């Protein structure tokens, strides 16, 4: 399936970085203090969420203070020697790590080594100026991240969720083709499954970002319901992808299906693919009949193994029973997805009728 992708050349975070740098320079020029350290701090302080900007800003300030202190100390005793740079960098990194100021280590180290060549005397004054410039960069960037284009990830998460439905269905289709042919799945299918897992991880990360900033911004009830819907959908899709991953790892070339069993399995998986492509909004009666047939097959295979008494070690589940179990598990997730969608639609209709 060909999908039209929209590429944003300049995203919100890039725009906010530019605004933060611009405002930081204006503030520094107004107070007649050096701009370079403030600008560096402003750039790295822009985070995906306002919460992270505040938390990491509180870490970067003391870290930069440590870097500045080491820079001035070693410059005072050793001058502008190579050893001054090395010791300032090393001591800054070690101290930040020991004090668990991990988010500020990079900025602090850059500050330390950059201060040495531009400071010839008045070391304490230079130290205080550096604190002022660092504070300016942190404060300006945090305010910009909080008030200008505040991050909202609900639409992005919804887009990722829809893409996951489509790609998951496509992988199921590829796996079905391999099953029908009795061959191992292709490297392309394995690669596609890896990409789906990466997309899922990305979507879950966006959910975490949205949750972090949830308390700082107002949301309508509709936005809150929409967010909770996609959050639950992602959780269930994560389980579906887990079951598909198990299917991909199950040896299908050793399966010994009857023609009728293979046909029922084929029709069931085709039905699952259609449901996924429809975002689990509808499951017809024919699908439930196929699931009942598949359920009977599963217990038949399990009972056959239970009565089997081999002389040597054997697996408690055959490849056939594993495949049937995973497909039935995927169906359970589809039912939950459908119930969630129906509940969401019902709440929307109720609220529309009230208003």
From Swiss-Prot:
Coiled coil: none annotated. One of its GO terms (cellular component) is plasma membrane. It is found in: Cell membrane. The chain crosses the membrane at residues 19-39, 74-94, 109-129, 131-151. The keyword Transmembrane applies. Keywords: Cell membrane, Membrane, Transmembrane, Transmembrane helix. InterPro entries: ArAE_1 (IPR010343). It comes from the Bacteria. It is a multi-pass membrane protein. Belongs to the UPF0421 family. This is UPF0421 protein BCE_2776. It comes from Bacillus cereus (strain ATCC 10987 / NRS 248). The lineage of its organism: Bacteria, Bacillati, Bacillota, Bacilli, Bacillales.
């Amino acid at each position: 399936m060909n999908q039209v992708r929209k590429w944003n050349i300049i995203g919100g975070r890039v725009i906010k970085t530019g605004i933060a740098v611009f405002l930081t320079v204006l503030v520094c020029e107004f107070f007649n203090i050096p701009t370079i350290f403030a600008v560096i701090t402003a750039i790295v302080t822009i985070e995906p969420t306002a919460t992270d900007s505040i938390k990491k800003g509180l870490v970067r300030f003391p870290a930069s203070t440590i870097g500045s202190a080491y820079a001035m100390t070693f410059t005072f005793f050793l001058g502008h020697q190579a050893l001054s740079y090395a010791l300032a960098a090393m001591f800054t990194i070690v101290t930040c790590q020991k004090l668990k100021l991990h988010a500020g280590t990079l900025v602090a180290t850059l500050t330390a080594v950059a201060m040495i060549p531009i400071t010839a005397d008045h070391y304490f004054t230079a130290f205080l100026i550096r604190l002022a410039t660092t504070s300016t960069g942190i404060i300006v960037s945090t305010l910009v991240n909080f008030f200008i284009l505040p991050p909202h990830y609900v639409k992005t998460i919804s887009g990722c969720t829809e893409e996951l439905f489509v790609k998951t269905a496509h992988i199921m289709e590829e796996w079905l083709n391999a099953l029908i042919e009795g061959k191992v799945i292709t490297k392309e299918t394995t690669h596609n499954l890896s990409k789906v897992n990466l997309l899922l991880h990305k979507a879950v990360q966006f959910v975490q970002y949205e949750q972090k900033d949830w308390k700082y911004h107002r949301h309508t009830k509709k936005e809150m319901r929409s967010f909770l819907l996609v959050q639950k959908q992602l959780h269930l899709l994560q389980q579906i992808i887990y079951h598909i991953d198990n299917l991909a790892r199950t040896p299908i070339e050793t399966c010994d299906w009857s023609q009728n069993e293979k046909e029922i399995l084929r029709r069931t998986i085709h039905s699952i693919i259609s449901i996924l492509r429809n975002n689990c909004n509808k499951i017809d009666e024919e699908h439930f009949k196929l699931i009942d047939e598949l359920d009977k097959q599963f217990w038949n295979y399990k009972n056959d193994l239970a009565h089997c008494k081999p002389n040597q070690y054997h697996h408690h589940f055959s490849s056939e029973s594993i495949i049937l179990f995973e497909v039935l598990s995927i169906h359970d997730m589809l039912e939950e997805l459908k119930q969630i969608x129906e509940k969401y639609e019902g709440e929307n209709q109720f609220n529309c009728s009230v208003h």
